[in-house]
């Protein structure tokens, strides 16, 4: 059976793994999921990630990050979904928690944070909020 929203599945796996204090979480890999994991690593929300498995069925393994026994990611939620895509122009990209969190945006120049998209002057699809 095919998955209707692989990005929501990725975010849910991360959220569920952190609730039970797992150190790593594994999921099927794709280019978009790897790009999201790269943004999460660059922003300091995860310790790292690696792509394992065969070329036919690659697996993305994310190493979660904790601080003083609590997950670094307090909130991670999907914004744009298959039934209702959310696109924002370069001037209307939202801030998450007045800049304390990040919005991950898929643009014509790749997947990036809201701050980087504003700096580059590009808009795109708002994939998720992370705080």
From Swiss-Prot:
SUPFAM superfamilies, alphabetized: Ribosomal protein S8
Record field: transmembrane: none
Gene Ontology MF annotations: rRNA binding; structural constituent of ribosome
Signal peptide interval: none
A cellular component term, taken from the record's GO annotations: ribosome
GO annotation, biological process: translation
Keywords assigned: Ribonucleoprotein, Ribosomal protein, RNA-binding, rRNA-binding
PANTHER family cross-referenced by the UniProt entry: 40S RIBOSOMAL PROTEIN S15A
Function: One of the primary rRNA binding proteins, it binds directly to 16S rRNA central domain where it helps coordinate assembly of the platform of the 30S subunit.
HAMAP family recorded: Ribosomal_uS8_B
Entry similarity comment: Belongs to the universal ribosomal protein uS8 family.
Subunit note: Part of the 30S ribosomal subunit. Contacts proteins S5 and S12.
Entry protein name: Small ribosomal subunit protein uS8
Organism, scientific name: Bordetella pertussis (strain Tohama I / ATCC BAA-589 / NCTC 13251)
Gene: rpsH
């Amino acid at each position: 059976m095919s998955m209707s929203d692989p990005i929501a599945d990725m975010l849910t796996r991360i959220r569920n793994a952190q609730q039970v204090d797992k150190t790593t979480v594994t999921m099927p890999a794709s280019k978009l999921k790897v790009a999201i994991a790269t943004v999460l690593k660059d922003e300091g929300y995860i310790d790292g990630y690696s792509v394992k498995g065969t070329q036919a069925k690659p697996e993305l393994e994310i190493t979660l990050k904790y601080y003083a026994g609590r997950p670094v990611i307090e909130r991670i939620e999907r914004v744009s979904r298959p039934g209702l895509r959310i696109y924002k122009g370069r001037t209307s990209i939202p801030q998450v928690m007045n800049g304390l969190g990040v919005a991950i945006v898929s643009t014509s120049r790749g997947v990036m944070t809201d701050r980087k998209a504003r700096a580059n002057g590009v808009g795109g699809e708002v994939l998720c909020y992370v705080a």
